A protein has these predicted regions:
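N-terminal Rossmann-like FAD-binding beta1-loop-alpha1 element of flavoenzymes
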Residues: 4-31
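Glycine-rich flavin
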Residues: 2-4, 25-27, 33-131
Length: 131
């Protein structure tokens, strides 16, 4: 069993902000996120940022006055790749911001409450109990 001052489930805006703040106060903090693809939360990965990126790039394509389907298809593929690059970079930066803090540990796995003070985390490699 690993003991922490705080266990935060979810690596979204609230979780990462709280973890960084508590970590800077020298609290030992565990952050649990179900998937590496969701570090940073919904906004960064599947919400605000990717949506705004695709909307912007669709407007760029619209004003490019393409004349063939192939030109639009190429713009679409480039937009999807640009969205992927942006979300990957933001996800990595969010992970590094927490992982670089000595008192914060990030777990990638599924969290379940065992009791009011214990959380079980099932990762790809092991099952850990946090308290």
């Amino acid at each position: 069993m690993k003991k922490y001052d705080a266990i935060i489930i979810g690596f979204g805006k609230g979780g990462k902000t709280l973890a960084a703040d508590l970590g800077s106060r020298v609290w030992t903090v565990a952050v649990v996120e179900r998937s590496k693809e969701m570090y940073g939360g919904t906004c960064i990965n599947i919400g605000c940022i990717p949506t705004k990126t695709l909307v912007h790039l669709s407007k760029v394509a619209q004003y490019s006055h393409f004349t063939t389907f192939e030109q639009y298809a190429d713009a679409f593929h480039k937009a999807i790749e640009e969205k992927r690059k942006i979300t990957a970079a933001l996800r990595q930066k969010n992970f590094e911001n927490l992982d670089s803090k000595e008192t914060v540990t990030v777990y990638t796995g599924v969290a379940s409450f065992l009791s009011p003070t214990e959380v079980e985390v099932k990762t790809d490699r092991e099952t850990i109990v946090l308290q």
